[in-house]
Design a protein with these regions (language model features):
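Compact, glycine-rich, soluble single-domain proteins
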Residues: 2-78
Length: 78
């Protein structure tokens, strides 16, 4: 699936991943390929992006929004 993690200042990550784990106001959530459409508000927490090569990118986010649609996870970090 395609993943983009962006802040107002820069693109933090853009690429392919197998899984994304983040925390919303409703708790931790994991996204895999084919996930149903989703929109949520992020809280301060670590977001982990699992890349196709087996490595993991970690981002400490202060909050923001996450949207999942058409096999794409978009994270707008604050």
């Amino acid at each position: 699936m395609n993943v983009a993690v962006v802040s107002p200042e820069e693109v933090l990550f853009e690429g392919e991943a197998t899984q994304v784990i983040t925390r919303t106001t409703d708790g931790d959530v994991a996204f895999l390929a084919g996930h149903a459409p989703f929109v949520g508000t992020l809280v301060e927490a670590e977001t982990r992006v699992y890349l196709t090569d087996g490595s993991v990118r970690e981002f400490q986010l202060a909050g923001g929004f996450v949207e999942v649609s058409n096999d794409t996870v978009s994270i707008l970090a604050t």
